[in-house]
Amino acid sequence: MFKTATCLTVTLAGLTAFAEVGSIRMGEDGIKRSSASAEERLALIAPVAAGVLRCRPTFCSCGVCYGAPARLEGVRFEYRQAGGEWTTADDFTYFEETRDYRGSLLGLEENTDYEIRVAQGDKVLASEKTRTWSSEIKIAKTVTLDPARIKFPLEIRDRGNPTGWIRYTMPSGKTIVNDTDQPAIVLDGAQFVVLEGLKIEGGKASKSIRLKGTKCVRILNCELYGWGRDSEVKYDGLGRPFVPGSPAPTVNRNANGGFSMKGSKGQISGDYAIEIDRGCCETVIERCYIHDCRVHANSWYYSHPAGGGAILARSPDHSTVIRWNDLVGSDLHRWDDAVTSGGNFSEDGGLNRDADVYGNFMIFANDDCIELDGGQQNVRCWGNRFESSLVGVSIQGCMVSPVYVFQNGFYGMCDQFGNAGQTVKTGGGAHGNEAYAFVRKNLFWGDGMGMIWMPLLRSQLKDNVFCGNQKIVRQESSPLSSSVGDRFGVEIPEEGLSGNLPVRPVGFRLSRSRFSGITVKAGKVEPGALSFSAKSTCDRPLGFTIAKNRDFPWFNVIPETGVIPAGGEVTFTVTFDTAKMNDRHFYRGAFLVRTAEGLSRAVSL
């Protein structure tokens, strides 16, 4: 079983436009808002009652809500490890509509008891004890799957318990090949179940793994690729993918550039490898390599992207964790979003509430690397590396809040045609009336628009680094937003980008994480070869394998397998196959130096 303390302990203080989008309205002031009634909003937000302190921990964070009929003078939110010294938490905000305080505790220790209290002066108004999650779980039963005997979809309804999880795995070196039009696995009402070490290719359904009404399901160290429906592009259908043989839709455009479309039944949207459905809670997706969807999402050059991606969060109830995954698209099979939301402008949409997204590598989306749109109630996105996509993180449709975006690296935003959008997207849709976004200590590097301030979204920026021309746009439109300690116009050479992003407990670091400027002229590649090294940061040898998408046959990495000695170093060479570099304008790719545990460092080209 994987343990986070193996080499390093980490502690740090789409479908969008086509389905399940909450309705919005344009106010007389020209500002977009949710069209839901106050009663409907409260039902979806599910605020706590007056005097109630609700704490929802994950591995290293805890979402906290405290019900209060009115704003309290001098109120403090404090926490400590059991028996330790009290620490006052920052960024707890009172919300008039729901009559509660909300905020998150960050940088907690895994598998640790904490005490949390609300205090005013010398009086303790409420207190709770909680415990953060553990990576180590007790397995009561292991089911070893035989790929040759699986009937698709494999339906799992098992119910383990907190002291006895049920694990599904398979022999190493085998592959589950799904050649049907059904998902490979459907978990329906399953509880305390682990999928670990599965390698699944196919099938022709819109999903590979579906979670329906589950509690405490973990998907660990799996590889998913080659799923998605057969498709063809209809350029008279806004350039989007359609089921082959579908009639072309009728598109009517208006003077403002908008459009309506009829006859779009065959359009393909939402082909995501993993779907977390409404009602699921305490889901973990960790150390997975998801790549090579069969559907290519169109660029905004034609219309709003449609196609596929890696993970779809369709309003799970609470406590979803997506960590340490590699979600790698390609120019031949771009993601729509790598991670997308269902119910973008709904108060319970997207990841909804009390969720963590950290330590992930997401690359090659024609829209967003990750779409947090929806509730965003104590949703935290940190320590990730977002790259070569139109948008890094979308927090538009922040309907409840607070949302936290911090310590991420945004590298070279671009769609398949090289166009860049907002690096952190806020504009284009509605926000909640009291929405807060805390955006801190992020690196905005390379192409990208930076961030736009919106009237209803209180963007609290602090200590971000904006390189090149990236900046904050329309600051005058949001007088309640702030920028403190942000730096602009900073120049950082590509070779100076950290090899430690995304943040992961992996026992080595890379001397270089990104190479750009690769050109092909007259059958020659410049530069002819690239080199970098991996240096150990732990006291044991680490075996590795180079992992790359099937869409990247035009380069090779040597050595492909090997061992990084304890305290030692391995040098790698990237070479190019010019015979396979004659069919496109751009050659962009990525690969992973990946351990058997599923942890990796990524290099992009």
Please give the residue ranges for each predicted region.
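Extracellular beta-strand/beta-solenoid scaffold signature
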Residues: T180-I185, K204-R210, V233-D277, N298-D317, ...
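Predominantly extracellular beta-rich ligand-binding scaffolds that present long acidic/polar faces
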Residues: Y404-P502
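Extracellular beta-strand-rich solenoid/capping regions of secreted or surface-exposed proteins
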Residues: G107, A148-R167, I176-R218, D230, ...
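Recognizes extended acidic, P/S/T-rich segments that occur
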Residues: R76-N111
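Long, low-complexity ectodomains and other extracytoplasmic segments of secretory-pathway proteins
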Residues: V503-G543, A596-L605
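A short beta-strand micro-motif common to beta-rich folds, especially ectodomain repeats
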Residues: R584-E597
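Surface-exposed binding patches on compact interaction domains or structured appendages
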Residues: V506-T519, T537-T575
